[in-house]
From Swiss-Prot:
A motif (Gly-Pro-Asn (GPN)-loop) lies at residues 85-87. The keyword Phosphoprotein does not apply. Belongs to the GPN-loop GTPase family. This is GPN-loop GTPase 2. One of its GO terms (molecular function) is GTPase activity.
Amino acid sequence: MADACSEMDRGAEKYPLLGFGQAVIGPPGSGKSTYVRAMQALLARMGRKSAIINLDPAGEDEPGAAVSLRELLGLEEVMSELRLGPNGSLLYCMEYLQENLDWLRARLQGLRGTYLLLDCPGQVELYTHHPALPDILRRLGGWGLRLCAVHLVDSHYCTDPAKFISVLCTSLSTMLHVELPHINVLSKMDLIEQYGRLAFNLDYYTEVMDLSFLVEQLTSDPFFRRHKRLHEKLAGVIEDYGLVTFMPLSIKDDKSLQLVLSAVDKASGFCFGEAKQSLGNLMSVAVGADFQFTSTLAFQEKYVENDGRTVEEETLDL
C-alpha cells in the first residue's frame, strides 16, 4: 500500500494538478451541498471556472457535478454486499477511495486549473478521528492542489451553551486533524434564533470570546451544574489553543458569501496568485478583518432580536 502511494505521488509530481479549491466539510444538515451550489454560482458570476467534486457516497449526485464518488461505489451497494450499517459503510467507502486514488486523479486530470469545490461526507468521525479523509486531502495537496477546508456549523447551536461548547470542541479537533488552511463558518444565519435567543451579542460567538461567561450560563441549568468543572476544562482547552473563530453566513446574503470566498482565497493563497496580482486585491486582504466585523454587526441587526436596542447599546452591557 505504501509503495503504491509513493509511486502515485511520484507520478503526481511529474503531472501536477495545479489549481485551488475548497474542501467543504461539516456535520449532517449544516448546509454543505447548498453552500457548494451557491459558491459555484458566485464563482460563475465572477468569471472563475469551477467544478463540483462529490465525495459523499451517501447523498444524491449534485446537479452538474463534474466528478462523483458514486461512479466508483455507492453507500447502498456497500451496505447490501458487505452487510454493514450506514456509518461502517461510509468509512469503508472513504478507505476504498483512499486505496484507489488513481481513479480520482484520472478524473481530475481533465480539470487542471479549474477551481474545485469538494462536497465531503457529513460523518463527524471522518474529520475528528478517522485517517482516511485527511490522508486523501493531503495527497490532493501533494498533486499541486491548494485546498482550504471550509467547516460549516449550523448557527442555531449558538443558542444552546452546551451545544456551542461541543461545536467548539469539534471544530478544534477538526482543525488539528485535517491539517489544512481552515475557515469555520456559522451557516443558516437567517435561522439563528429559530430555536431560542442568544445569550450574548453575535460577535461573542464568532470571535469566541471569554468562555467563562458561557460556562456560567450552563450552571443556571440544574442538569449541567454538576458538570461545571468538565465544561471549565473544555473551555480552557479551547482558549489555550486560541484557533477557533467563525464567519457568519447566510446563503440569502450574497455579500456574506463573498466575504467567505475572500477569506478562503487569502487562506489558500489564491489572492496572491498571478490571476489576481493587483495592489487593490492585496489591500482588500489587509483590511478584510474590518469587513468581517461589519458583516457580523449587519447580521446582528438583521437576524438577532435585541429588544429595540442597537448593537452598540447591547455591547455596553458586556
